[in-house]
Amino acid sequence: MLKSNNTSEATTRKVGDKTAKKVFFRRRKGCPLSVPNAPVIDYKNPELLIKFVSEGGRMLPSRITNVCAKKQRKLNNAIKIARILALLPFVFQAK
């Protein structure tokens, strides 16, 4: 039987002769649209909606914008409605 000592390997990794420190992950910030005094998600507010659209015109995912799932669905629907009503372009111009 092979015995392995994984307890010391889990805490630190050896890189060459030096030992690397533990990797700490950044704490995710909360939803920017769920804080008090946050702007209301509405298709009639293209200034807000354009912040959640990429340069190519695609909707940004919630892992990039840090928006919660409920607000992400509202954002997606508002962006789609704004595009249909010609408040937002479907495709942005390449510069």
UniProtKB/Swiss-Prot annotation:
Record-linked PROSITE patterns: RIBOSOMAL_S18
GO cellular component terms listed in the entry, alphabetical order: cytosolic small ribosomal subunit
GO molecular function: small ribosomal subunit rRNA binding; structural constituent of ribosome
Pfam families to which the protein is assigned, alphabetical: Ribosomal_S18 (PF01084)
Gene3D superfamilies reported in the protein's UniProt record: Ribosomal protein S18
GO biological process: translation
Spans through the membrane: none
Keywords for the protein's UniProt record, in alphabetical order: Ribonucleoprotein, Ribosomal protein, RNA-binding, rRNA-binding
UniProt cross-references to InterPro entries, sorted A to Z: Ribosomal_bS18, Ribosomal_bS18_CS, Ribosomal_bS18_sf
Keyword RNA-binding part of the UniProt annotation: yes
Role this protein plays: Binds as a heterodimer with protein bS6 to the central domain of the 16S rRNA, where it helps stabilize the platform of the 30S subunit.
Similarity remark: Belongs to the bacterial ribosomal protein bS18 family.
Assembly with partners or alone: Part of the 30S ribosomal subunit. Forms a tight heterodimer with protein bS6.
Official protein name in the record: Small ribosomal subunit protein bS18
Gene: rpsR
